[in-house]
Amino acid sequence: MKVSDRRKFEKANFDEFESALNNKNDLVHCPSITLFESIPTEVRSFYEDEKSGLIKVVKFRTGAMDRKRSFEKIVVSVMVGKNVQKFLTFVEDEPDFQGGPIPSKYLIPKKINLMVYTLFQVHTLKFNRKDYDTLSLFYLNRGYYNELSFRVLERCHEIASARPNDSSTMRTFTDFVSGAPIVRSLQKSTIRRYGYNLAPHMFLLLHVDELSIFSAYQASLPGEKKVDTERLKRDLCPRKPIEIKYFSQICNDMMNKKDRLGDVLATAQRIRRRYNKNSSSEPRLKTLDGLTSERWIQWLGLESDYHCSFSSTRNAEDVVAGEAASSDHHQKISRVTRKRPREPKSTNDILVAGQKLFGSSFEFRDLHQLRLCHEIYMADTPSVAVQAPPGYGKTELFHLPLIALASKGDVKYVSFLFVPYTVLLANCMIRLSRCGCLNVAPVRNFIEEGCDGVTDLYVGIYDDLASTNFTDRIAAWENIVECTFRTNNVKLGYLIVDEFHNFETEVYRQSQFGGITNLDFDAFEKAIFLSGTAPEAVADAALQRIGLTGLAKKSMDINELKRSEDLSRGLSSYPTRMFNLIKEKSEVPLGHVHKIWKKVESQPEEALKLLLALFEIEPESKAIVVASTTNEVEELACSWRKYFRVVWIHGKLGAAEKVSRTKEFVTDGSMRVLIGTKLVTEGIDIKQLMMVIMLDNRLNIIELIQGVGRLRDGGLCYLLSRKNSWAARNRKGELPPIKEGCITEQVREFYGLESKKGKKGQHVGCCGSRTDLSADTVELIERMDRLAEKQATASMSIVALPSSFQESNSSDRCRKYCSSDEDSDTCIHGSANASTNATTNSSTNATTTASTNVRTSATTTASINVRTSATTTESTNSSTNATTTASTNVRTSATTTASINVRTSATTTESTNSNTSATTTESTDSNTSATTTESTDSNTSATTTASTNSSTNATTTASTNSSTNATTTESTNASAKEDANKDGNAEDNRFHPVTDINKESYKRKGSQMVLLERKKLKAQFPNTSENMNVLQFLGFRSDEIKHLFLYGIDIYFCPEGVFTQYGLCKGCQKMFELCVCWAGQKVSYRRMAWEALAVERMLRNDEEYKEYLEDIEPYHGDPVGYLKFFSVKRGEIYSQIQRNYAWYLAITRRRETISVLDSTRGKQGSQVFRMSGRQIKELYYKVWSNLRESKTEVLQYFLNWDEKKCREEWEAKDDTVFVEALEKVGVFQRLRSMTSAGLQGPQYVKLQFSRHHRQLRSRYELSLGMHLRDQLALGVTPSKVPHWTAFLSMLIGLFYNKTFRQKLEYLLEQISEVWLLPHWVDLANVEVLAADNTRVPLYMLMVAVHKELDSDDVPDGRFDIILLCRDSSREVGE
């Protein structure tokens, strides 16, 4: 005997072990004493597991002092003969069972014994190992039987509720012990609670034909006594009253109104007595067991899922004859199989899944996304790895196939998704369960209760994937499913691992991933590994670390998908196929995010400045701050709570707390900032996120990309480092920190892309470049810059962060700004002001009579002072610092006689001053610097009459006021501007001046008139809380909107000066205090206004639209007013669009065929309309071949046939360089000066090359393969067809080519004018029938007509004659 772990045993007898290998008995007792460790251990029993080849041993520590800890788990390898076997011991106390424990292949014996005792209330039943294996299924799949129990109780409740007075129903639902009706006690609210108690009984009755309960129970009775019904009732019935009630009621309704399982067993025993004289009674008894199970399946309504294949009409003689012929003394019972039609997979399944998830207008982002979805769903490749940039839509790559699998009726697929961190769990489950397409549950449910038969996808973290319980359940999947669901049509689907690069890069967690190597990967249909930061080297190492072969040696191109027929080796030994979308697209990721690297003195102070500025500009936005340590996370959270609502997360929190906090931040719109370590940068999808700030000095390139990738739709990312401290040393095995310099170049180097250092297009969203940024991001940058300039001009700076942290949340403080209609920045709430209370008047100095002073420091008689510091008689001062007689001062700092001052700083006689800084007559108030007469002053600071007050810069009554240059008589000017603190801390105002600016966003909610206007607008435009567009507002149907939708229309569509004022509210273009936007509004009034302007453009030609812009000049700065003006004509505009665009919808939506032969003018006036489809295609390819050879600028050529050269355009490898080349040669500037493009904003045409036309781009790229086949069919030399950017340049040039447009509309009679670029692009992609009835895209016909206009075949002046004839015919027709 050789011991692998070199332990020495004092005494060991392995003869019994060796004999056990050949022993056929279920239970083998071994009396030997083996010292596995220092405590003597008695081996009670052991057996060989046929599947795993392990010998499983149950042992008991005879010398243990604590019997509850007497068992422990240990695996020891010993040499038995020539074979090495492993002995496994169970971790449990000695079971309370007379016959001794029998080990199970699935779980420890104590749970089985507990279940037997719960069901039968006895200790004397002796089952064989098969019974234990069957009983153990309950614990492995408890969730499934819980769901069945809920269904049973719901059915009972429905029956009782439908027939409450029926006597038979009352008997059925009657407690057999007390005889009292129990219908009233069964309520919907208690069904789930009672269902858990009922689940073991449901399991037992469904599997009654697989257990030896009947025969074993009789054998356990003493002496000659056989069946005793009362004994059965005592032994077999549950003891709890609640269990008695519901268990008896369902048994009553199932077995001919008989009570409980005891009567079922009594019936079985009577049948046994009938055949007691020969052994053939046993098979008959087994048949009854099958019948019992079948009845239960029928009663539960599971016939649609299960079909009992055995016959219920077999007689005893047939059974005896069959038994005699069988060598086995047990008859084989036919399995219950699932009866469902087979449904093959189809590529259309993915499209249907997308429409279920996103609506009928669903289209793929691009060709790569479509092919990858088909690869995952249709191909036989067992293991797939995908690298795609953050925000690309990696989730949909497996989400759509999972929905397609769930729609299949023949097989139930159960898939698993694992993410690296707990904080992603809640976010993933919310995203994947939307629209109800998938049933999603935590993987913990599967580990604890097993498969419930309902869930399609279980979601967990890497620790769950590595756990022993999970790997054991997957290893026993086939046996569990066959015994539980009685079918083999419940299969393991996909194993999906998100952000799998962590297996290699997370050095400190690699020891936790060791258990993954024990997972049976071959049990899954397919393994899918996803990441945004896993180049080939990282991906290969990560896959090998978890026990897979790694990547295929040959890197696979997504355009060369090949199917492998040799899959016999299994998933774990098969190389993983890698699809690198970043290399395929050759575009550097994250170009849509503006990345700024700043070195600052204090990272927290700079971060706070940026956050406050962001929330001043975008009050509803969110931000993420990444800190380097857990202590820093908590310190920042405590410090910033007084400014905005904060959620903080780090690794020391519990799993449930992480999930709860993440869900709160994602779903609660009032939460502003998420602070955490790097675990918050992976996988979280937050729609309102507009800023990411990173304070980690050890940030590596993967963490940077993951953090920036949270900004899905653009935004700002700041990397803040302390001066002279960025160079941080990386820990062993980790990636080095990022270096100073261009971030884009480091991203290119990481992904293995071509370096552009020192070349055009090097900077993409970094180093000040804004070329690739969206319009919203550019506008956000500009507004942040302007706000920073204002702060610098005002010399507002931040002092040091406070050393003590307050735990109270300052959200209440923010609510104060939002809730009060009378709040003012100059109010003082329960505090004393120590700095400039009761100071002098600023702005202008004037003496006025019968005038209106705005923002002035003045002495006035019979006037109205608005926002002034003034001395007034018989006047009303609103929001001013004034001295007044017989007046009412609201929100003012005033000197008053016989007046009521509300929240003002005032000088008063016979008045009441509340929350004010006041100057009064003949009295002195300590601690407030105020003088009053017959008045009450609270929390004030003021200047008085005939006195000089400290802490103020004012003197009164026949005096001269310093710093104001104002002359007053018997009056006091006080508190022109106060530094006020709402919470009694005067230092807060000096801490961060931006806080005062931040309050402006809340002041806009203060006016009653504004609130009233806001409510009116919300009622007039109710759908702005959803993703509504102006076409929905007009009343168009969704199928019409799909083709009329205004792709590419944004704020740059508006001419300069129209809805583009800066320094105002971004949503409504009003001053912040007059803002009419409301919380939860997803579509701004400004956006609806520019879409409404685009709708008006749809109905007008160039001259008419230019006149229209002049007519709406009063609304150029008022999008809300324009919307009201537009909505008045809502019905008229709808009818006009339906009338003018009926032809367009017929072609694009209903796909009516356009035939060139149907156009009489076309056949007579153009040779193109007499050409075949083959000739049109040849001409199209020839035009592009000539353009490519001559390096002609495409847009300019199709605009006016100018063959100007632009080599950079043809050599550009991405869209950014292409657009830069066009801008360099002045194409966009010439286009605006020569065409109607000047009626739009200066950036409108340029931005069409960004992300506006994704769906059309995807459709065009899908057609590239067709073009290649056409060239081969035509017999021409295959040439490169234009890529999307060049193709779009062609369409833009044709759209603004007025001469070409006029001729095309004249020749092709089926079309008319379209005045929006997106409609023109959509129209160009429809198909037309050429003269030989072959289909060609309309854009090919357009190029042919354009070429004909440029040729010498058209006589000079011929086209003008044609247009003249057309205009004449129109006049005659009209």
Curated annotation (Swiss-Prot):
One GO BP annotation of this record: telomere maintenance via recombination
Induction summary: Induced in absence of telomerase TLC1.
UniProt keywords, alphabetically: ATP-binding, Helicase, Hydrolase, Isomerase, Nucleotide-binding, Repeat
Keyword Transferase annotated: no
Binding site for ATP: 388-395
Domain Helicase ATP-binding: 375-552
UniProt key word Lipoprotein: no
Residue spans of biased composition, Low complexity class: 832-975
Single annotated GO MF: ATP hydrolysis activity
Region (Disordered): 832-999
Purpose: Catalyzes DNA unwinding and is involved in telomerase-independent telomere maintenance.
Protein name: Y' element ATP-dependent helicase YML133C
Organism: Saccharomyces cerevisiae (strain ATCC 204508 / S288c)
